[in-house]
Structures are given as C-alpha cells and as structure tokens.
Amino acid sequence: MTQLAIGKPAPLGAHYDGQGVNFTLFSAHAERVELCVFDANGQEHRYDLPGHSGDIWHGYLPDARPGLRYGYRVHGPWQPAEGHRFNPAKLLIDPCARQIDGEFKDNPLLHAGHNEPDYRDNAAIAPKCVVVVDHYDWEDDAPPRTPWGSTIIYEAHVKGLTYLHPEIPVEIRGTYKALGHPVMINYLKQLGITALELLPVAQFASEPRLQRMGLSNYWGYNPVAMFALHPAYACSPETALHEFRDAIKALHKAGIEVILDIVLNHSAELDLDGPLFSLRGIDNRSYYWIREDGDYHNWTGCGNTLNLSHPAVVDYASACLRYWVETCHVDGFRFDLAAVMGRTPEFRQDAPLFTAIQNCPVLSQVKLIAEPWDIAPGGYQVGNFPPLFAEWNDHFRDAARRFWLHYDLPLGAFAGRFAASSDVFKRNGRLPSAAINLVTAHDGFTLRDCVCFNHKHNEANGEENRDGTNNNYSNNHGKEGLGGSLDLVERRRDSIHALLTTLLLSQGTPMLLAGDEHGHSQHGNNNAYCQDNQLTWLDWSQASSGLTAFTAALIHLRKRIPALVENRWWEEGDGNVRWLNRYAQPLSTDEWQNGPKQLQILLSDRFLIAINATLEVTEIVLPAGEWHAIPPFAGEDNPVITAVWQGPAHGLCVFQR
C-alpha cells in the first residue's frame, strides 16, 4: 500500500504537481487527521497525514492524479461546552476543495449529533472532494478596470438571467456558458452595463428545512465549498471552471467586468441542529464565533458566524478571494453581511481581514463592495467601512421610494441622497462612488412590484408570509396586484420612470436589478430566496421593450454628464450642481424642509432634471436659456422651450441647453 510522504504545509488544499498530490488542512485542535481517498469502485483508503507544522496537517500522496476523490476524518475531543465537536465517523469536505462530487441532501447521517456524537459512518453518502488540475488559456485577457465613476452595475442570477431567454440555445440556458453568449453580451452592451454582479456562484447547499418542504435555496447564500463553482450552473460539472472562465473572458472582451457576490459570514452547517459538512468537524472552535456555553453566536441569522478575526480563518478567506481573482480573473466582490468581516467581536475598520485585504497587492486592486450590516447589536455600519470599500446605500433606496411613492420625504433629504449621501460617505478620503445606490436588489420587491403591491406576498415560501421585510415603502397606486385600468398602468409606469431616473442620474455608483429594466415581477414576493421557478426567472418573451429602451437611454445619458462620471464631491459654486425651486431660484431653508415636492437639479450647467412630485400639474419655470427635452423624455426633434415646463403630477423631465 502506498504511504504518504510528509509533503509541504502550503498552500492549503489539494495540489497536483505532475507526480502526485500534496494535501494540507488547518486544524488547531485536532489530535489526528486521516486523508480518505476513494477508488473508482468507491472503496475507501485511509492515510494518516504525517506532517504537522504548527496548526497545519499535511502529506503527499505519490502517483495520485487529478480526478481523485477524497475527504478527511478529523480526530479530537467531543467537548460541546468548549466548542469542540470532532467526530471521525463523518467524512469532511476540504474547505479549499475546488470541485465536489455528490449532493448535499437532507440525511441524518450528515449530522454529527447535538449533545451526543452520532458515530454512524457516513462515507457512503457524503459528498467527496475532487482533485483538479488547472490548465487554461486566457489568451490576451485583461481586466477592463472601469473607473468607479463610469461603473454601472447589473445584479443578476446566473440561472434566472438566461434560463428563459429565447435567443440563447436551449442546452446552455441557465448556465455559465449562457453568460458569455453573444446574445447576452450584446444585450448588456446595448443597455450600457459595465459590471455584471453575480449572485453566489461558489458551491452552496439547500437547507434541510427547505428540502423537506420541496423547495431549494435559489439565491445561493448558504456556502459549503468556497473555492468550488456551483455545479448546477455548468453544462457539465467536470468543465464548470472552464465554462465560467470562458464567460469571463468573453465579457472582458466586451469591456464588462464581473463581480462575485461572496458569502464569508457563515456556512451551510447552520446551527447545532444543522448538517456537518466541513468546518464544524475540522476545527469548530477556530472557524466559528463560539459563545461561552459552546453554542454559536448567530450574528448572521443563519445559525453560525465565521470568526474572521482568527488568523487562520483570515488566511482562509484571503486565499479564497485571491483564488477567484487569480484563477478566474474576476474583477471584484460584493460581500454579503459584510459587517461580520470587521468583527473582533466589535466592528473595527482595522479588523484583521480588512487589514489583510488592504495589504494584499491582488485584492487591494479589485472592486470591493460591502453589504454594510449584520443582525447583531452594532451591526448597522453604513458609511463605516475602510476607504477601499464601496457600500450598499440603503439610505438612497428608502429615500427614493419614500419621495416618489410615499410623498413624505423633504426636498433636503432627497437632495442629500441624490448627492451620493455625502453626510454618510464623505470621510476618510472616500469618493462619491463609495455609495452604491440602489432602488431594488435581489432581496426585496422588484421595481415593478414596488408600484403594484403594498404588502408582501411570500406564502409560497412556506412560512405563512412571516418572512421578508414589512418595510417596503411601496405603493400599489390603488389596487393590489398586477394589471388594472389604463390609467393605473400609466401611473405605475410614471412612478417606475421616476425611480429609474433618480437611480441612474444621481451621484454615486448605480446598481440595477436584472429584470427591472423590462418590468419583471415576482408577484409580490419580497424574499424569493427559495423560488427556483418562473417567479424568479426573467421572462424575456414578456419583457417591456419600451421600458428597456427608456433604461438604456438613461444610462447613456448618465455617461454624458461630467458631474456624474468625474467622481468628485460636489462643492458650492464648482459648476457641478445647482439646486433650484420651481421658479429657477435657489431654494430657501424653509423650502428645503417644508416646501412643495418641486425641484430643479442643474448638472454641469447644461443638464436639467425638473421634478414635480406633487399631486397636481405644475408650471416649472426653467432657468435662463434655450432648453429642449432629451431622450428618453422626448424624441430627437424637440421644440425649444424657453420658459416653462408643464410638469405632470408625479412627473419629471430632463432637458439640455
């Protein structure tokens, strides 16, 4: 029987060198680690890892080849009160595995036990890691490196974006390949998108609770193997990595960046009643934040929280991020529940992972976007991330909806959000692009649902409509649900136009939710994380071409306005912005706080956004000059308007002089 050589303690994971495979695994509290390899017949062969350098266990298996399936059994104490839950009866996934064979099914054998260990062996049904070799021809691929000031983000789901697209070949719809298909790339280019932000593509599992209800985790925020691509999005699991990189290469050639939504805050092992896949059995005490009673700190709402202040976990997270940049050429990351990244346990800008990213010559050069909160006390950290990070700006989302749909926001508050929320982000040398402005995202109502539903309708999620937020700031315009009279449809359309214009012509970095540009609805479901069906898949056959053209025209207009693309804070008198009332005069203090919802925003001294957010048609006196309405608010041939615009109720228009 082949014996393991000691091998090397780095890098982490399984690496083929042409002669064999080096295996390394971190565990600070293990007493023994067994490498378990499986032959073509499924027969298991076990080897003790002979090397033990600090907290790294390692060994080298001569003659091992790519395609070898493996896992680990880790021996150590079962002391739940101390945070130790070692159970060598359970086969464990390598945290750095780059491919997984098998499915993460709801099975009692995939649990380690709660108070007492479950010593039933699970190797027969446990997913296995696969050794991969990395050979790929990137040709002349180069990152687009779009300046932040010119960035337009499009948030999309790999499957949902393309699964129903009639012009993409059936056999590749819903896959990585479809992202790189010319039809999709041409669409993104025509729309004006510069960055495609993908919901999680690292391998994830569906929670046992969902599986028992016949549902699945659709969004992907339940990670199980952070270095492995989710195989369900590949035409073939064995070629997933090549398919993904082919798509990135094609997108790069078109000048489109790729940003990955990544989940470093928790794992699919959930709470103590959750499954055992990997980290809990390898070194529970090190990988997770553990309470004094041995249970998890649940700062994520998902049952556990990764301890990103632990040096080994920081190394793991950093290696994961570098892998996606160096191996897959991704251009940035959006970090889910990113306040966890800064917990020590208190949130700190100089937390270990932030410092590691700042000091990394690879990671410090890509786009970094934080979802700047978690659910723990002190978890709301909007505006408090280190300067390298941009942040989701929920202030903007709520203000835009309140202004146009609830009519309860003063002009001053609206203008502050329009100006990149400088009261929040203008600090520590940060630029306006640090504010990722959004009106909608995957989490919440779609844009169409914002104007069609007053209340969430999440019954299909199986929680009796308890899940999902109740704070939607939506307005159904008098009738709950889709459809209605022509007048109702037109009023809803006008509100959509107003919200899109506010999003795409405000200072900061705009993020558009895929499907909003053609009227996609989730029928009032504002938490569709478990709906892998036509509720979430974009129906291109029903797409509103008029709304798509309107959105594209706004994006292309944005790119013409220096005040929006130069990425400099607006200062009084610098020519970037003037705030005027309905009479083209500067607003008084009282008008900012108590005046009617009528406003003119003059950008770069040439572009004028005239707003009438009142219930009545109102005359808006334009500033001096010869003005004409510009697309998408008018055709190419427009009469000159010298004095007054008849502003419709809840309307706006953009002019140029």
Curated annotation (Swiss-Prot):
Site description Transition state stabilizer, residues in chain:
443
Q: Annotated region Disordered: where?
A: 458-479
Segments passing through the bilayer: none
The active site is formed by: 336 (nucleophile), 371 (proton donor)
* An annotated GO BP: glycogen catabolic process
Q: Which UniProt keywords apply?
A: Carbohydrate metabolism, Glycogen metabolism, Glycosidase, Hydrolase
GO MF annotation list? glycogen debranching enzyme activity; hydrolase activity, hydrolyzing O-glycosyl compounds
Cited InterPro entries: GlgX_C (IPR040784), GlgX_Isoamylase_N_E_set (IPR044505), Glyco_hydro_13_cat_dom (IPR006047), Glyco_hydro_13_N (IPR004193), Glyco_hydro_b (IPR013780), Glycogen_debranch_bac (IPR022844), Glycogen_debranch_GlgX (IPR011837), Glycoside_hydrolase_SF (IPR017853)
EC class, as a word, reads hydrolase
- For this protein, the Enzyme Commission number is 3.2.1.196
Q: Where is the composition biased (Basic and acidic residues)?
A: 458-467
Read off the HAMAP family from this record.
Answer: GlgX
Q: What is this protein called?
A: Glycogen debranching enzyme
Catalytically driven reaction(s): Hydrolysis of (1->6)-alpha-D-glucosidic linkages to branches with degrees of polymerization of three or four glucose residues in limit dextrin
* CDD domains linked to this entry: AmyAc_Glg_debranch, E_set_GDE_Isoamylase_N
Name its pathway.
Answer: Glycan degradation; glycogen degradation
